Amino acid sequence: MTTPHTPDPHELAALRERYRLERERRVRPDGAAQYRDADAEFGYYAADPHTEGPADRAPLHDLVDVVVIGGGFGGILTGARLRQQGVARVRIVEKGGDFGGTWYWNRYPGVHCDVESHVYLPMLDETGYVPEWKYAPGDEIRRHAVRIATRFDLYADALFSTGVTALTWDEASETWLVSTDRGDDFRAAYVVSATGTLTDPKLPGIPGIEDFAGHTFHTSRWDYAYTGGTPEGGMTRLVDKRVGIVGTGATGIQAIPMLAEDAGHLYVFQRTPSTVDERANRRTVPGDVGAGRAGWASERRDNFLRIVSGESAGRDLVADRWTTSAGLLEKLLPSFRRHGDRHTFEAAYEAADAAKMNELRARVDRCVTDPEAAEKLKPWYRYACKRPTFSDLYYPAFNRDNVTLVDTADTHGIERVTADGVVVGGTAYALDCLIFATGFNVGTSGIHSGRLPVRGRDGVHLLDRWRRQGPRTLHGFTSNGFPNLIQLGTLQNASSVNFTHILDEQAVHVAALVAAAEADDALIEPSPASEEAWLAVLAEGAPDHEWFHAECTPGYYNREGRGRPNGPIAYPHGAVAFHRLLGEWREKSLSEVLRSRTVPRA
């Protein structure tokens, strides 16, 4: 590939203006309120298509050591690391019918991971498994989740098709009362929230959505009974169907090429095009990744994290589009490590960003034969405004006669849904099937959604307290007034594009906290002073990203165009440094969060 042209100041100014105009075409006054939850009258969009229904069982009223809310990789890894620390009674509560989390739910055609499988799949060293593909399909990932759960005996106490509805601290017993939608009221010495960020599907609030007389579903609940086929394709029941799909983000990029092959006619309704870089997926053998060496997977995973976090790494073991574009992730990740003078960095960043985006727009012209369609598919915004996507199949799908791209930018999305189809720009599109690839309520699942009330000491409601004074944690995990409650996620810690690595580091930390508390017959609870000190760490050196996201095209990164305010939301020196900090803290300062019990552990 030729070296990208570096734009001059006049070209950069022209790009800024084009980006502004394209953003204004898409910003809606209702912001994130344009979406609705898949609940109440729309609850069927979130129903589980992979199980016939919850298995009959009596409600539980027992006591466990640890309850983990969520059976995705966060919950599985927490359970596994707790087992390694000798914790016996671990109960994972999961809304789905099996382990897997987002990989249990997302089985749409073409589903793959967008991070290399040899770094994405956790515990490869421990299980001895070597992925079969550079970028694993969903089924391989789901099977690995089950492999880990089986290896660490996590099925023994697991509750599937069960949602936690309330967490209440009982001071008299110093345990948490856990209530579920299956009538359970059991107790746990510790609670770990691992509900993930890609679990609750969202729908566009299009007028008339409930009036559609055809078939409809969300991609995270794919209806193969209607389409036929499998995630590998073969949707033979669509051969005579007019299919519409709404959404061209990470899911749409993967599902659209498969639908294009099988549908009688496919209409793709696009508000904002994604960046779509090359994928170059292929089968792999152990020798490709040095899998014969002890610790090979941890080495590869650590190498990838260093590069995409802005650290030096010597050589690039993964060598894909994530790593070669790593410098542009600074605006995507609040916890990216930055170097040098701010002004110099921003100038160089803008030039590199423009060169990369010009390269990606040129790729559209090379892949799409129709100039009008190609122009609609070009992304006019900065690289980190949306999560990058990767596919070698997406653009060629628009060269097919049975695929129509419908641009909805000027109408701020589909105008309305009718019994027969949808209307965009005054044009009616008749459909037999309408599929929503509209994503999830990112970052608002579980405790943060408000649908899971958590009451700590003196009946204090966690979210009420945070609404009044802002989130208060130590390292993002624990909070004063909520003993033995530990949260996984991205709040006030560090994240990265390879989220399973982050989750595994968090699981190791959780297991160490629980093991220390058990050894000392103690409760885990930071002091208010510890929380304040951590807020100060987060605030010092926090990135100024507010202006960047305010200029971005609308999406979930900037609250649909409302911007993302600066603040103490993430550790500002990178995930590698954060993991190092946690390790040193566990060695030297963990006892600071241990408080003596007043009631003996049952």
Residue ranges of predicted features:
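Acidic/histidine-rich helix-loop elements
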Residues: G229-T230
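Residues forming the Rossmann-fold NAD(P)(H) cofactor-binding site
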Residues: I76, I253
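N-terminal FAD-binding dinucleotide-binding subdomain shared by FAD-dependent oxidases/monooxygenases
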Residues: T2-V66, R83-E210, A225, M235-D240, ...
